[in-house]
Amino acid sequence: MTETAAARDRLEKPTLNYPFEQPPQPGSALEVAPGVVWMRMPLPMMLNHINIWGIEDAVDGEAGWAIVDTGMRTDETLAAWRQLFANATDGKKLSRIFCTHMHPDHVGMAGWLTKKFKCRLWMTRLEYLNCRVLTADTGREAPDDGIVFYHRAGWSDAAIENYRAR
């Protein structure tokens, strides 16, 4: 064993220290700092939740909550949001929605929430457009204009064939 490996073995392994004993249950919020709440939404996969954040906010003088990310569009997430609105928002509406990126667990409920509260969605143009492209994908045969586009973008013949075969 080298001296470096022996020294590494003697080091104490770091541990995680959690500031809260339990995470919030879906449909509830836990205040982590003044004006900031931590929420969790369920996910139907191995990673069974996404952390979502609420920040006290005001738009045009009306108090509300800005949220960061929305959860995946599932019946369970919809039920959790409804429970939050009934119990944990102090009667305040959502004022704006920030989506960090276009993965379905981060942006999946954005449409429903923006319509329900008539608030704006904030995300980068690139993430928004990528999301729109992916939701427009019907799973049908690759369109000719898509093949031309990707060919002009420099995709190899193998990559284009993979795109066609999807």
Where is each model-derived feature located?
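Conserved beta-strand hairpin/beta-sheet module of binuclear metal-dependent hydrolase folds
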Residues: P26-K92
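A short, structure-level motif marking secondary-structure boundaries and short turns
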Residues: E12-K13, I67, L94-R96
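Short amphipathic alpha-helical surface micro-motifs
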Residues: P19-Q22, P34-V37, P104
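Residue-identity detector for glutamine
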Residues: Q22-Q25, Q83, E161-R164
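N-terminal presequences and immediately downstream first alpha-helices
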Residues: M1-E21
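Active-site HxH/HxHxD metal-binding segment of metal-dependent hydrolases
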Residues: E76, A86-R166
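A generic structural signal for short
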Residues: L16, R40, F98-C99
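Alpha-helical context
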Residues: R8, E12-T15, E31, G61, ...
